[in-house]
From Swiss-Prot:
Belongs to the protease inhibitor I3 (leguminous Kunitz-type inhibitor) family. The lineage of its organism: Eukaryota, Viridiplantae, Streptophyta, Embryophyta, Tracheophyta. InterPro entries: Kunitz_inhibitor_STI-like_sf (IPR011065), Prot_inh_Kunz-lg (IPR002160). Keywords: Disulfide bond, Protease inhibitor, Serine protease inhibitor, Signal. Residues 1-25 form the signal peptide. This is Kunitz-type trypsin inhibitor KTI2. It comes from Glycine max. Has probably no trypsin inhibitor activity. KTi2 is responsible for most of the Kunitz trypsin inhibitor activity and protein found in soybean seeds.
Length: 204
């Protein structure tokens, strides 16, 4: 019994030490220059708006329910609020912290029942796409990295497979499918550059 407890404590300590921020680690900042709160809700908006907006769910291919994570085609649409949560016991989120990401909420959709909200990576049509699927997912975690030190609040999302080296992590970028839907996918060196804005409920 004692050996089981000691082993569990060892795993927790090893995981925590592996992801302690370095002395130069910086907090991820929102558009108000405030650090992102661990477990807080934010809009993730593209720095270059063009004709596209925030992040939301949509159905692609043969999906009936909106299980694919996409970028809105409407530049005025901020998308759905995202909850960023690190398992580390920290009040704020710093660069390269391991993160889970989920949508804050979904509208009730007939025939779909209770929608999953947590992001995952799934192999699909030769791509590794960001989805809300609960099966056949790639084990790993997301993190946030600055794109340029010149712009302290411009960032990219990165996905790291479990037990992979840093050089195996990949950026989250955009792939436009045949229907013009802008899907979030793993993309080598072509990240979607974003900023984070505090989420404010329309009912607040």
């Amino acid at each position: 019994m004692k050996s089981t407890i000691f082993f569990a404590l060892f795993l927790v300590c090893a995981f925590t030490i592996s992801y302690l921020p370095s002395a130069t680690a910086q907090f991820v900042l929102d558009t108000d220059d405030d650090p992102l709160q661990n477990g807080g809700t934010y809009y993730m908006l593209p720095v270059m708006r063009g004709k596209s907006g925030g992040i939301e769910g949509n159905s692609t291919g043969k999906e009936i329910c909106p299980l694919t994570v996409v970028q809105s085609p409407n530049k005025h649409n901020k998308g759905i609020g995202l909850v960023f949560k690190s398992p580390l016991h920290a009040l704020f989120i710093a660069e390269r912290y391991p993160l889970s990401i989920k949508f804050d909420s979904f509208a009730v959709i007939p025939l779909c029942g209770v929608m999953p909200t947590k992001w995952a990576i799934v192999e699909r049509e030769g791509l590794q796409a960001v989805t809300l699927a609960a099966r056949d997912t790639v084990d790993g975690w997301f993190n946030i990295e600055r794109v340029s030190r010149e712009y302290n609040d411009y960032y990219k999302l990165v996905f790291c497979p479990q037990e992979a080296e840093d050089n195996k992590c990949e950026d989250i970028g955009i792939q436009i499918d045949n229907d013009g839907i802008r899907r979030l996918v793993l993309s080598k060196n072509k990240p979607l550059v974003v900023e984070f804005q505090k989420f404010r409920s329309s009912t607040a």
